[in-house]
């Protein structure tokens, strides 16, 4: 795959040493879901403990919500050992109620969480948030984007959404947010369009407070790429990104469907300013997943090459139902070389 105008990493080696494992499967009792479907992981370390925030349906139906799982305090990041957060009677517990946000996420639910911590100049303090796409009416959208905010004890839902479509090319719906806080700005990559219409454009914006004053909504990647998410992480003196290219049409997915990796000196708002992407997973049918999407990843340290890439998958169940598909969550462990030499991007 070639991205026109992409900058190069002169010494980049091909990824190596890969292994993948299934974490959650609603039809496999050993994964502990008990029939629930939880995917869209956002993985983060909070106070010396690794947490995973997930979107899904605790009973396999109804409006989706955000749930959590964690590793034991002090344990290193791992693909295994995740324990879902449950209530006193064993039920899955959402991370927050709908005390204020139901007007914009009440019936269609909460989708695709993205954890981030950044400075809120309005309050004059650091804010920890879980951004997500909310649907007011229908599970399938249209969507807007808002967040839950940590108050020191619990996650609090917000009465106002933070971001909505306002450009013609967005077609009234924005979702799949991925955020970082860098250089005094909340930077967000997101999907605009609709899966049902097979129209997916990737956008980019930034804001000083993460809820108002967003920059002009800019196209990050065109619709023909079918980019579904773009997750960015700092590493060393540069930034890594892993994204998925999806296939929501009929027939066999084309070879470019799957997960891709690229790097850049800065978290640029144009795909052409990142390195030439390298495919790290294809749409090959592995039984419990094919055509992976919605990845979150972390490295084993700021200069490490070993990355854990959490991703969504699905498989057909064969059930005589209108939607005979089960959604799974997996993890790919892969070595991603640092690479040290970049050509200067055009926007530098």
State where each predicted segment sits.
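Carbohydrate-active catalytic/glycan-binding domains of CAZyme proteins
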Residues: 2-348
């Amino acid at each position: 795959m070639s991205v026109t105008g992409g900058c190069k990493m002169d010494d980049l080696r091909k990824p190596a040493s890969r292994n993948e494992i299934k974490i959650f499967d609603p039809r496999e009792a050993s994964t502990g879901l008990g029939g629930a479907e939880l995917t869209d992981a956002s993985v983060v370390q909070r106070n010396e403990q690794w947490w995973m925030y997930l979107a899904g349906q605790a009973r396999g139906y109804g409006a989706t919500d955000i749930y959590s799982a964690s590793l034991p305090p002090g344990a290193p990041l791992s693909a295994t050992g995740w324990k879902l957060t449950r209530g006193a009677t064993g039920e899955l517990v959402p991370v927050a109620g709908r005390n204020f946000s139901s007007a914009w996420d009440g019936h269609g639910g909460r989708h695709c969480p993205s954890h981030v911590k950044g400075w809120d100049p309005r309050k004059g303090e650091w804010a920890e948030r879980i951004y997500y796409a909310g649907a007011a009416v229908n599970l399938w959208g249209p969507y807007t984007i808002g967040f839950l905010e940590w108050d020191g004890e619990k996650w609090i839902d917000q009465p106002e959404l933070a971001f909505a479509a306002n450009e013609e090319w967005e077609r009234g719906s924005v979702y799949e947010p991925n955020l970082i806080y860098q250089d005094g700005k909340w930077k967000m990559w997101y999907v605009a369009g609709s899966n049902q219409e097979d129209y997916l454009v990737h956008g980019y914006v930034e804001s000083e407070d993460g809820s108002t004053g967003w920059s002009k909504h800019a196209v990050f990647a065109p619709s023909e790429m079918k980019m579904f998410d773009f997750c960015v992480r700092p590493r060393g003196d540069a930034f890594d990104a892993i994204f998925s290219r999806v296939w929501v049409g009929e027939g066999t997915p084309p070879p470019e469907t799957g997960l891709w990796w690229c790097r850049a000196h800065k978290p640029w708002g144009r795909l052409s300013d990142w390195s030439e992407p390298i495919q790290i997973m294809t749409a090959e049918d592995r039984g419990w997943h094919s055509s992976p999407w919605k990845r979150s990843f972390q490295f084993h340290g700021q200069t490490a090459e070993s990355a854990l890439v959490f991703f969504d998958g699905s498989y057909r169940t064969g059930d005589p139902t209108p939607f005979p598909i089960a959604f799974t969550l997996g993890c790919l462990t892969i070595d991603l070389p640092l690479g040290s030499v970049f050509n200067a991007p055009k926007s530098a």
